[in-house]
Amino acid sequence: LGECDVALAGGVSESIRAYGIFAGFKSQGALAAHEDPTQASRPFDRGRNGIVVSEGGCIYVLERLNDALARDAHIVAEVLGYRINSDGTDYVLPNPERQEECIRQAIENAGLSPSMIDLVSSHATSTPQGDEQECKALRNVFGDSTETLINNTKSFIGHSMGAAGAIELAGNLPSFADGYAHATINLDDLDPSCALSGLVENEAKKKAGGIETILNNSFGMLGIN
């Protein structure tokens, strides 16, 4: 845009010592409980019952492609497009129609079509209603395509709040090099309402032809997509 040469973008969250976060999710019935903590975060599974709060951080350096090439930078990805919108309906419950709109507009902004998306990094937080609503949006955009793979990083690391989007994208960037979409783990009993044709269940999957495009979903409270 001609306003800056380099920008830092990402997120950092120190959440696990913040009592209010746990109390808030608990009061909403959205905090996960499981006898085995390693299996508590289980997006799309029938037994999912809430968020596993985690923390971490990830920061990206953003610059013009020509500038990065000129300094011989190690380029991990190119930002093709983005979109942000608001559900405008409920403090907690998502609106799949607005999520779908956000996804479609992001793809359009990138100059692509849904069939050109190789991998979707889903936002699903392991909550009963949130996961189902996102799946409705994804199903409306990608239909029954098996060519667009869909996975979830929170199944491994939980929900790192404001850092989640940046961290989950980082978890999928290696796909550009090796062509593998990492799995969505802890999927022992897939909820039919969350069934997606391209869902990568429990084991990583290599995509024929490689992975060249990633759509990274981040849908926050207050309906901010």
Located regions from the model:
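Beta-strand segments within the central parallel beta-sheet cores of soluble alpha/beta enzyme folds
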Residues: 4-13, 74-82, 115-122, 148-155, ...
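Short glycine/threonine-rich loop-to-helix capping motif typified by GTGT followed
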Residues: 88-99, 125-142, 160-168, 201
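A glycine- and small-aliphatic-rich helix-loop capping segment at beta-alpha/alpha-beta transitions
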Residues: 21-35, 97-99, 133-145
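Short beta-alpha connecting loops at secondary-structure transitions
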Residues: 46, 87, 152-158
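Stable alpha-helical structural segments in soluble proteins, enriched in small hydrophobic residues
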Residues: 102-110, 137, 141, 172, ...
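Condensing-enzyme catalytic core mediating Claisen C-C bond formation in acyl metabolism
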Residues: 36-110, 118-119
